[in-house]
From Swiss-Prot:
Sequence ranges of Basic and acidic residues compositional bias: 1-20, 30-39, 156-170
Region (Disordered): 1-195
Name by which UniProt lists this protein: Uncharacterized protein MISP3
Family annotation (InterPro entries): AKAP2_C (IPR029304), MISP/MISP3-like (IPR042779)
Domain of life: Eukaryota
Keywords: Coiled coil
Protein family membership: Belongs to the MISP family.
Species per Swiss-Prot/TrEMBL record: Homo sapiens
Amino acid sequence: METPIEREIRRSCEREESLRRSRGLSPGRAGRELVELRVRPVLNLPGPGPALPRALERARAGAQMQRDIEREAHRQAALARPAVPEPRARSPPQPLGELKRFFEAAAGSGSSAGAGDGAGPQRLPEPGGRPRSAVQGGCRVLGSAPPPFTPSLLEQEVRAVREREQELQRQRRSVYGTAEFKEPTPSLTASRGDGKLVVIWPPRRKVSENGLEQEERKP
């Protein structure tokens, strides 16, 4: 059976011969130059090489098993090894109550140092709660004075607000010209038919018109 490629080659050769005859040329030897090529299909290709001998397969499986056993032994040894002790954590900071008592005791000992020269060595509480002697190296050690009081940020803000409020009150008194200035308070009037009170702000002021006290009406 002729394949498509062989058919195409045959037709090409026939066209070439017809062209040579039409032009008076000697017939070529194209048919003689054709070479037959034998092609093997993919299914006929040789498969994988011969199987390994049984002894070689056993040796390779034994080596793999030996590696697995050694890996498991190393893992078991690492688990059985005692863990490294963790570094000791730092002691927690002393509570504020103990520090306060320590500073108070130090301040008290500093004030009574002159009166108690003939007395024995005084023992001051440490921040950890253990008493310690106030005499070190043959000389008396005075307790450290408590740190100076510094107002917190909140107290500073409150003080600044109070100062601003006092300054505003002084300015209002200077503007209104009386020392008995009072803050205006909202007035409650029943201006609706249902009897409910309505808050009017700012409150109505009484102004003088033609010598008569009248109430200022605002739309």
